[in-house]
From Swiss-Prot:
Residues annotated as the enzyme's active site: 96 (nucleophile), 121
Protein's name in the database: ATP-dependent Clp protease proteolytic subunit 1
Source organism (scientific name): Synechocystis sp. (strain ATCC 27184 / PCC 6803 / Kazusa)
Reactions it catalyzes: Hydrolysis of proteins to small peptides in the presence of ATP and magnesium. alpha-casein is the usual test substrate. In the absence of ATP, only oligopeptides shorter than five residues are hydrolyzed (such as succinyl-Leu-Tyr-|-NHMec, and Leu-Tyr-Leu-|-Tyr-Trp, in which cleavage of the -Tyr-|-Leu- and -Tyr-|-Trp bonds also occurs)
A single Gene Ontology CC term: endopeptidase Clp complex
Gene expressing this chain: clpP1
Length: 198
């Protein structure tokens, strides 16, 4: 069930679902596992907000256990392709692809609430079938591992070797630890706004 917000204006009452109301404030919410369906919605919202105002920041709130690498890379590429800065804010959990997207926000505008958890690791996968099919899948997951690690190294300022070692297994961090690591820039208690810039 999605809550509805009622707004009253000179033209009467108008009902919005909560996500549409947040979109008016340039807030996009990724609050579940990253899958093709919700990744497409995030991409569409980012493109819409760029068309509305290409200069004004967009706020991407993330509370996600991770998910599909290809779907997440679609969001990542869109974040980098559009003109507005995308400020990322972790609320609750940003794990796996969620942490990757958190770190991909505009430099200086990657944030977390103080009690959030952030986790990085290597991509997960599995294969079955003939030996040749398994070999193809193994090559693909190794390619994705190298790609994600290189981007994480770029986002954090860490060496590729350090990122590769740290993502070998689940690596959980507090908000402060993820700031020290370079995944985020700030631990915040209040939401940034136009009157209270980052």
């Amino acid at each position: 069930m999605i809550p509805t917000v009622i707004e009253t204006s000179g033209r009467g009452d108008r009902a919005f679902d909560i996500y549409s109301r947040l979109l008016r404030e340039r807030i996009v919410f990724l609050g579940q596992e990253v899958r093709d369906e919700n990744a497409n919605l995030v991409v569409a919202q980012l493109l819409f907000l760029e068309a509305e105002d290409p200069e004004k920041d967009i706020y991407l709130y993330i509370n996600s256990p991770g998910g599909s690498v290809s779907a997440g890379l679609g969001i990542f590429d869109t974040m980098n392709q559009i003109r507005p800065d995308v400020c990322t804010i972790c609320i609750g959990l940003a794990a796996s692809m969620g942490a990757f997207l958190l770190s991909a926000g505009a430099k200086g505008k990657r944030m977390s609430l103080p009690n959030s958890r952030i986790m990085i690791h290597q991509p997960l996968g599995g294969a079955q079938g003939q030996a040749t099919d398994i070999e193809i899948q193994a090559k693909e997951i190794l390619y994705l591992k190298a790609l994600l690690n290189q981007h994480l190294a770029n986002h954090t300022g860490k060496s590729l070797e350090e990122i590769t070692a740290d993502t070998e297994r689940d690596f959980f961090m507090s908000a402060e630890e993820s700031k020290e690591y370079g995944l985020i820039d700030q631990v915040i208690n209040r939401r940034p706004s136009a009157s209270d810039p980052i």
